[in-house]
Structures are given as C-alpha cells and as structure tokens.
Regions:
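ASCE P-loop NTPase motor core, strongest for the SF2 helicase catalytic module
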Residues: 1-190, 199-224, 228
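Long, charge-dense, solvent-exposed interaction surfaces that engage phosphate-rich ligands
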Residues: 195
C-alpha cells in the first residue's frame, strides 16, 4: 500500500478498536477498496472472523471486481458471492459479497447471520434517507459499519446525514433537527461557524483525501487506472 493508504487503513482500524464505524470518502482512484480489504484481513488475523462474518454490499457492476481484489490482496480470506436466482448463502465464508438489490430484499436473511462488519461500497446509493433501499441497509445488524464513497455529498447535506446515520445511527440526530441545526445554516446562510462545528463533530469517523492534496500527489503513480 502507498503511505496515504496505510494511513487510511490505520485510521479505520483505530476506529474499529474504539467501536466506531468509518466513512472513507477518498477521491475515486485513491484505493478505498484496498484500504478496506487490508482492514478485513486484519480482522481475520485477529480471530474476529472465527465466529462472525463480514457482509460487503456493492453495486452489481462491482461484484466480480471485489471478488478478484480480495483474491489478489487477501487470499487468506474465504470469500463467497450471494447473488443470482439460485443464490445460496455461503455460511463458511469470512466475507460475503452481495448487491444492493439482494440486500434490500433479504434483510431477514442477513440478520440471521452474526455479522462483525457491514461494508457498503458506493454508499451514495443510500443518500435518500426515506428510500426503501436505505431503510433496508440501515436495518441490517452488525457490530461495525463501514461506508465507502468518493462522492458522499452530490447535491444536499442531507445526503451526508443519511450515510453518517448508517455508520453511526442517531449520532447527528433526527433528519429535521439536522436540517435546522446544520443544513439550513450551512447551505442557505453560508454560516462558517456552523460549518466548522459540523466538521469537528464528524471528523473522528470521516476521512476524505483528494487527488489534488499535495501529499497525495507525491505518492500517486503516473497513471491510475483502477480504484485500488
């Protein structure tokens, strides 16, 4: 891993030790997947997956990518796909990979598992807090929750609230309280004091690095072709 990726992995691991989830929101191409895989491998090495499992929820287009990346970077992890019309739950796998569509339909199935971690990739898929998909993902029980997104806010700050509420339920309060306390002052009034407060209270479990960051630029290869 590159140095900034090691920092991201260590940050997520420290959060996990404290019982905190994480939102890793690095720019696309900076290796969010690799950082999370390193974390899952650490869980395996520490015996945390001896009796529990990890569920990774991804867009359908990323199923095979996740499987191949896990095989390449963490061959010690047992990996199973749960997808397709004849899907069968891989009870012996350390890591189960499924799609948002399956997760939405089978909350009961996943809540019968003992999940140590629930990871969602492209977490902007739950930006609409009232959508059935968002409610389903938030109702899957796990000791630890990790969200990955290169675009945690696409339009409104309430999208951010929805993802943070997945990682740490109720931490930012109810949606209406969040709107009056943060969204309106920041988006409508451009209140810098409120923005500073918001950044401080979310900083412990949100990490975002950009390709334009000086320290990142120095550590990047000449060409980035994939998100790892």
């Amino acid at each position: 891993m590159r140095s900034y990726q090691q920092v991201g992995y260590a940050w997520m691991y420290k959060n996990a030790q404290l019982g905190l989830g994480s939102l890793i929101a690095d720019d696309m191409g900076l290796g969010k997947t690799l950082q999370v895989i390193a974390l899952l491998l650490k869980f395996k090495e520490e015996g945390l997956l001896d009796q529990q499992q990890v569920l990774v929820v991804v867009p359908t287009s990323l199923l095979t990518n996740w499987k191949s990346e896990l095989a390449k970077f963490a061959p010690l992890l047992g990996v199973g796909l749960y997808h397709g019309p004849r899907r069968k739950l891989p009870h012996e796998a350390d890591v189960i990979i499924t799609t948002y569509g399956v997760a939405r339909m089978e909350v009961h199935t996943f809540n019968q598992l003992d999940l140590y971690a629930l990871v969602i990739d492209e977490a902007q898929a739950i930006k609409n807090s009232s959508a059935a998909q968002t409610e389903a993902l938030k109702s899957i029980q796990a000791t630890l929750k990790i969200a990955m997104s290169g675009t945690p806010v696409e339009n409104r700050l309430t999208e951010y609230w929805s993802i943070v509420d997945f990682v740490h339920p109720s931490y930012l309060g109810a949606m209406e309280d969040f709107k009056s306390r943060y969204s309106v002052p920041i988006e409508r009034d451009n209140d810098q004091m409120v923005l500073d407060t918001f950044r401080k209270i979310t900083a412990p479990f949100i990490l975002r690095r950009l390709k334009s960051d000086g320290s990142i630029i120095q550590d990047l290869p000449d060409k980035i072709e994939r998100d790892w």
